[in-house]
Amino acid sequence: MEHYSLAQLSKALHNREFSSVELTQHCINKIQSNKDLNAFISLDEDQALKEAQSADLVLKNGEGKPLTGIPMALKDLFCTKRLNTTCASKMLANFQAPYDATIVTKFKQNGAIIIGKTNMDEFAMGSSNENSYFGSVKNPWDRERVPGGSSGGSAAAVAGNLVPFAIGSDTGGSIRQPAAFCGISGIKPTYGLVSRYGMVAFASSLDQAGPFAKSAEDLAMILHCIAGFDSKDSTSVDRVIPDYSAEIKKPVDKIRIGLPSCFFQPQVEKGIQDAIHNAVKLFENLGAEIIEIDLKLQPFWVPCYYVIACAEASSNLSRYDGIRFGHRSKSASTLIELITNSRSEGFGNEVKRRILTGTHVLSSGFFDAYYLHAQKVRRLIRDELITTLNSVDVILGPTTPTTAFKLGEKINDPIQNYLADVFTVAANLAGLPAISIPTGFENKLPIGLQLMGKHFSESRLLAIAHHYQQHTNWHLANPNKQG
């Protein structure tokens, strides 16, 4: 059952081929036998099995929804009343939220079973999942390599067949990059499509929640469940949500694909370039029109992103002072010492680095030169991408410049870590939807292909990705049967 698609799982549960209790217990067993992946921070086994029993009764009465009785995992930055919400930080190691995030409520309403919460880079800051208070996550394809970040635990849980699907967040590539490294599918929706209420903020103008699964077909099922307006989120967009599962089954009209030359630079591994070119050839054979495009502002994507992201992070994380909530230092005799020591002890090195960077670019004398300038460049990047997408359906390229790197290889080189996001940050800066799907292997390590589309073009993106996956088998590869 672990190799079933979500649609197959849903059908099997509704047909009573096996029970939700059996499926949930199977996932719990898989998690327990793969503890070395370190994909989970917390498990809720007893409650999950109770909910599975309830789901079986609902299914028996023929009242189930598509996700009823299906176990899932949640990145540990979504607030949950039952389980701690740690953000993989000492600062919040014992924090229990008084409410559920909107996305959690939606899954409960749709009958999905939250089996546990996954490991991540601390406060979602990182591209390797090595910046966690609870230890590094390992890649199911090679346990000596990173799964990507910051949603590495969610990606590893799906790739390792521990759960059928999981939820992550994407601020600069934190869904798409781990999806690429772990050989699965992941989508960052348009900014405002999925509620951020109850999702602990890293950079509020960039953060967006989204799903991991094996295929675009599975992603469509999940996205239909979580998309939609939420009055509790001031950035939520009120618009009609299509039935993504139905949309991807419609015939795909002629596809116009934009192919940027800047995505094929020397620092992009040759195996990745070859895999992307092979994908382009397949699309051509399927009738797509390939259009060469020039993204002149691509060299500014990463520096612009890190100025804005760090600035917003320094502001968002200023609330953790050890007084209202968060880690409280025991070695302080004054208020200033309490705040200083609590933050010094509670935050890890990468989070401190980004807070300091953000504080610097927002400080007097540097605000205009860095932050304001970055916001102007952000607008130019957004305009260039929107103009380009007026002439093509999608922009296609590699999700990452390399395959998964070894644990510890880049941990002391933040610049190299930041450059892992070189192809993904633009979608966040512009608020565009983007999806990563598997497209091959290099030295037995997965390669990801990224498709970026217009605002609220998730139906088209998912349809094109599904069209590709109907003609390839990369998304069916399994770490136990390496490609």
Curated annotation (Swiss-Prot):
The EC number(s) this enzyme carries: 6.3.5.7
Key word RNA-binding present: no
Subunit architecture: Heterotrimer of A, B and C subunits.
Function text: Allows the formation of correctly charged Gln-tRNA(Gln) through the transamidation of misacylated Glu-tRNA(Gln) in organisms which lack glutaminyl-tRNA synthetase. The reaction takes place in the presence of glutamine and ATP through an activated gamma-phospho-Glu-tRNA(Gln).
Protein's organism: Legionella pneumophila (strain Paris)
Pfam families in alphabetical order: Amidase
An example molecular function term from Gene Ontology annotations: ATP binding
Gene name as annotated: gatA
Keyword Nucleotide-binding attached: yes
PANTHER family assigned to the protein according to its UniProt record, in alphabetical order: GLUTAMYL-TRNA(GLN) AMIDOTRANSFERASE SUBUNIT A, TRANSAMIDASE
GO biological process, one term: translation
Protein name per the record: Glutamyl-tRNA(Gln) amidotransferase subunit A
GO cellular component, one term: glutamyl-tRNA(Gln) amidotransferase complex
Family stated for the protein in its record: Belongs to the amidase family. GatA subfamily.
InterPro entries per UniProt: Amidase, Amidase_CS, Amidase_dom, AS_sf, GatA
Family annotation (HAMAP family): GatA
Keywords: ATP-binding, Ligase, Nucleotide-binding, Protein biosynthesis
Catalytic activity: L-glutamyl-tRNA(Gln) + L-glutamine + ATP + H2O = L-glutaminyl-tRNA(Gln) + L-glutamate + ADP + phosphate + H(+)
Active site: K75 (charge relay system), S150 (charge relay system), S174 (acyl-ester intermediate)
